[in-house]
A protein has these predicted regions:
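Short, conserved loop/helix-junction motifs that constitute active-site signature segments
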Residues: 137
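N-terminal subdomain of nucleotide-sugar transferases
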Residues: 1-66, 115-121
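Short His-centered aromatic/hydrophobic patch
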Residues: 126-130
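A conserved catalytic-core segment of Leloir-type glycosyltransferases
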Residues: 6-8, 46-114
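Short glycine-rich, flexible loops that bind phosphorylated cofactors or substrates
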Residues: 20, 132-133
Length: 137
């Protein structure tokens, strides 16, 4: 907080993938959210799996994806329920064809979530998602 405005911010930090030990994104989320919390702000992380490990006081909203990288073969991830949700089918088909759809599909799922929750936050601080769905917030 600064001298001009001593009101704490309500900050949302999206992260499509937040592995707590590798890759950097999950590690970044933990360190930055801890610092924001120490400054007196309210912080919530919305993440796909793998989920980050966060300090006490930082809320985690889990926004599941198909987590296709956890399968030896993406063909094994197929379930008929994929046909019900277009975003799930898109994620699966894109993965099968060598695409990296996680940022896009996370953004679309987050946009749906955000329609119900956007007024709870003052700031959205994105680290790496860069998804079109963020614009919809």
């Amino acid at each position: 907080m600064n001298k001009m405005n001593d009101k704490p911010l309500r900050i949302l930090m999206p992260s499509y993938r937040s592995h707590p030990f590798t890759g950097g994104q999950g590690i970044y989320m933990r360190l930055v959210t801890k610092a924001m919390l120490e400054l007196g702000h309210t912080v919530e992380v919305i993440s796909g799996q793998p989920y980050p490990i966060l300090d006490e006081g930082v809320k985690l909203t889990k926004l599941p994806s198909l987590d296709l990288y956890s399968y030896d073969s993406p063909l094994r991830a197929f379930k008929f329920k994929l046909l019900k949700e277009p975003i799930d089918l898109y994620e699966w088909l894109s993965h099968l064809s060598g695409g990296f759809s996680e940022p896009y599909t996370f953004g679309e799922r987050m946009a749906v979530w955000g329609r119900k929750n956007y007024n709870r936050f003052d700031v959205v601080h994105d680290n790496q998602t860069l998804a079109y769905g963020l614009i919809k917030l």
